[in-house]
Each structure stands twice: as structure tokens, then as C-alpha cells.
Design a protein with these regions (language model features):
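Residue "hotspots" at secondary-structure boundaries inside conserved domains
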Residues: 61-62
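Loop/turn positions that initiate beta-strands
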Residues: 65-66
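N-terminal capping segments
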Residues: 1-55, 72-73, 87
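Aromatic- and glycine-rich peptidoglycan recognition patches
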Residues: 15-19, 49-51, 55-58, 79-122
């Protein structure tokens, strides 16, 4: 199943590449690197805001492990929907896990709330 492979690749990427800073890898570059390893080595380049309209993903109401979480200008990969956890490349942390249900990634401190969840369409 692609979703599980996407989630595992993201988690492994975080473990091995957690020292990569945002200046070295933008959020879309992280997601693309994971998708290219887990799904398709020729996955096309997309900016964060291109993912929802790319035709490669379906919007879903309830995310599952391996789905994408999108904000205006930002994208990440859902790792644990029960804990509202995603992995992305953030300005403050580089490639790391964070929560999309509290703090900055849920609208606190001037941050943005997720606007959609996306599931890869095989």
C-alpha cells in the first residue's frame, strides 16, 4: 500500500536526514523526495500549493497515515492521524515531526490551519 510506504519513507528520512535545515530543503522538496523514493522516481516537481490541483491526489476529510497535509504555502506527510502528527521541513526545525492540531500549525502564534488532506491516487 502506497500510503504506508510513504509514511515509512518519511519517518526514515527524518531519522537519517533530520539535520537538513529548511534552507537546504523546502517543504515541497522534502515531500517530493519521499514520493520519489516511495512511489515514483519520476514524480514531477510541484510547489506546495500545486499538490491539491495536481490530479495525483484526492482530497479527503479524515487523513490516514501516509496522506499529505496542506496549508497555504506548506505541505507535509501525516504520520499518525490519531495523534495529529506530520513530518515536514519547517523553517524552525528542518525535517522533523510536528502536530497539525495545536500550536503554530493549527493557527496559533500567527500560523495557519491545515486547509486540506490529500491522498495519493494510484
Amino acid at each position: 500500500m502506497s500510503r504506508e510506504k510513504i509514511a515509512e519513507t518519511a519517518r526514515n528520512f527524518e531519522s537519517f536526514h533530520g539535520e537538513i535545515t529548511y534552507d537546504q530543503m523546502k517543504c515541497n522538496q522534502f515531500v517530493l523526495a519521499v514520493l520519489r523514493e516511495a512511489v515514483d522516481p519520476k514524480f514531477p516537481d510541484l510547489r506546495a500549493d500545486d499538490f491539491p490541483a495536481s490530479g495525483r491526489f484526492a482530497k479527503v476529510e479524515s487523513p490516514l497515515r501516509g496522506d499529505l497535509v496542506h496549508w497555504p504555502g506548506h505541505i507535509g506527510i501525516v504520520i499518525d492521524p490519531n495523534r495529529f502528527e506530520f513530518i515536514g521541513s519547517q523553517d524552525s526545525t528542518g525535517v522533523a515531526a510536528a502536530s497539525y492540531s495545536k500550536g503554530y500549525w493549527n493557527g496559533a502564534y500567527g500560523g495557519k490551519q491545515p486547509d486540506c488532506f490529500l491522498r495519493y491516487v494510484e
